[in-house]
Amino acid sequence: MNRELRTDLAGRRCANLPKGSPSLADPEVARLLQAVPEWKRSGKGIEREYKLSSYMSGVRLFALLAAIAEQEDHHPDALVRWRKVKLTLWTHTVDGLSENDFILASKLDAAFEEFQRSEGGA
């Protein structure tokens, strides 16, 4: 993991991108994925599955992550299942990936790490 890049991304805010803005080129996507190695390419976006100790832990985690997404005004597709929360990020206005996806992924991963500490692990 590129911790320096992850810290940089997590400290930034998602930008309001106008429709038709260009999506990221593959080399830039590969570089940014180094900051969030648990996230994988999936179609036009990136996705991650968080593993938890119970269904209710997943519900609590999703509430936390949803609040962060709302603050950033960048919202993932989400699926809450037994002991799992799966998120998919992509930027609709660019019809693909933007830096916003990696900014939010970095923030969500940091929140998950803190959540795990507060919940006593997954």
Feature map (PLM): residue ranges:
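Charge-rich alpha-helical segments
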Residues: 1-122
